[in-house]
């Protein structure tokens, strides 16, 4: 999300939109989620490249561009979530606690397939 969406992003999102619409037509319950990953080093680099001091201001502006792009393309997403939102953090923390509580986080040595 370190820059404006390009045709590749539009292609992938349009393909997902087609699938969501098709499955809705078939009567399936569909929850189509889109969003932006704002917790990346590339966002920091892009903000600095654009002489931005506040990284959050930069990702706020870029996220708005992405949301507007999907609106202009009439993407039928049910929700747009940003990784800097508290509701995302809460979900991620819940996931990692569940994984840890099941004992699925451990130190080891990778042995290959």
Predicted regions: what they are:
Residues 1-113:
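N-terminal, positively charged nucleic-acid-binding surface of large information/translation enzymes
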């Amino acid at each position: 999300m370190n820059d404006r969406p390009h045709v590749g992003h539009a292609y992938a999102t349009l393909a997902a939109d087609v699938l969501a619409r098709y499955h809705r037509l078939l009567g399936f319950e569909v929850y189509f989620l889109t969003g932006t990953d704002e917790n990346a080093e590339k966002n920091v680099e892009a903000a600095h490249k654009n002489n931005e001091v506040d990284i959050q201001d930069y990702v706020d502006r870029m996220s708005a561009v992405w949301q507007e792009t999907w609106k202009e393309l009439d993407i039928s997403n049910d929700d747009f979530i940003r990784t800097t939102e508290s509701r995302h953090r809460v979900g991620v923390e819940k996931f990692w606690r569940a994984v840890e509580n099941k004992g699925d986080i451990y130190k080891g040595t990778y042995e290959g397939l």
